[in-house]
Amino acid sequence: TQGGKPFDPARGKQYEAGVKYVPKDLPVVVTAAVYQLTKNNNLTADPANPTSGFSVQGGEIRSRGFELEAKAAVSANVNVTAAYSYTDAEYTHDTWYEGRRPAEVPRNMASLWADYTFHETALSGLTVGAGARYIGNTVTYYSSASPKAYESFNVAGYALADATVKYDLARFGLPGSSVGVNVNNIF
């Protein structure tokens, strides 16, 4: 604070409901969830000194959305996971941002992942996998000399590719243990 006093902790409240579907005849799991999160005691720009960099407490952010995920064992060796999430986030109480989407919170995110595990071969226990993630567009705010004090610009969505190689150590007497290398953001 401007007076040097520490802020109170931020508080959150979450409501969530979900379902899980596992068909009897297929090696598939499908989940869906809806949620609402509310964060109180968020820091917001000091209305008395908006461009000073000082904050006051009292802002509130609400996020509502849903998530979908499907996992399938395509074969004894191949697993595929696909996921999608939608988030509608908004400052519901804030000095400058009320009614706006919080910075760096995408509305849409999606991912697709596949892995192949070797069984009963010389490579038994080895898993290789690859996937892609999509992060939708976001908004970012910056300070300006305008009467609004904070302006915004959109940041375009982007996709990332990831990969993994891991080895199950069960054959060495360490069931449940593995070693692996993950490479994120390959391109």
Residue ranges and their predicted role:
Residues 15, 103-187:
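Conserved C-terminal beta-signal and adjacent last beta-strands/turns
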Residues 4-8, 55-57, 97-103, 151-154:
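Outer-membrane beta-barrel domain signature
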Residues 25-27, 78, 122, 173:
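Secondary-structure boundary/capping signal
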Residues 1, 28, 38, 42, ...:
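Extracytoplasmic low-complexity repetitive segments enriched in small/polar residues
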Residues 36, 56-143:
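Gram-negative outer-membrane beta-barrel transporters
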Residues 1-5, 42-51, 87-99, 139-148:
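Outer-membrane beta-barrel translocator domains and adjoining extracellular loop/strand segments
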Residues 9-66, 73, 85, 89-91:
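Membrane-embedded beta-barrel scaffold of Gram-negative outer-membrane proteins
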Residues 3, 54-57, 66, 161, ...:
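Residue-level marker for the onset of beta-strands and adjacent loop->beta junctions
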